[in-house]
Amino acid sequence: VLHSCQQLEQMGFEVTYLPVDESGKVSLSDIENAITTKTILVSIIMVNNEIGTIQQIAEISKLIKRVASSYNTSILFHTDAVQAAGYLDLDVKRLGVDLLSLSAHKFYGPKGVGCLFIKRGIPFEPQQAGGGQERERRSGTLNVPGIVGLGNAIELAESRRNMAVIHCSNLRDKLIKALVETIPGTKLNGHAVDRVANNVNVSF
């Protein structure tokens, strides 16, 4: 996402980058203050891939809609949910997102394939021109094994999500406790509570 934003800047778009606090959380007030009448898209990563901090996506969505309404405009909301699949609820209606991206290998699917949820009614143009595949939304011969593998993998990950969260969070918490108690000066990086179940990041 970062490199895509940098590429958009080179094309003439104005991009605003927001800071996070020491736990990796983005402030709702910072988001609100950054939105202007020219804002067309907000993109927030759901789970930080390094420190595991979980952002409050549903609350951010409500904020964006409220501010957009006050400006009498519409703002699209995208979340990069790559690190969240298999551990967090990705119900797009509950989250209130317009766009959500996933990568199959993060939930034990095949490498080299991902998916993008686009809310019905949102117009978009393909990145590549060519054949009429996928109703002219993506040119080129479809990677059928990859697509089927992604679909099956996310179904399996979702069916085992609750069990995986309990198992991984227990192991995570035991490891954090052991590190803190055993190695003096150990510092947990990321949010202590709003943290994905399969992440431990510490500094010594």
For each feature predicted by the language model, list its residue ranges.
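Pyridoxal 5′-phosphate
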Residues: V1-F204
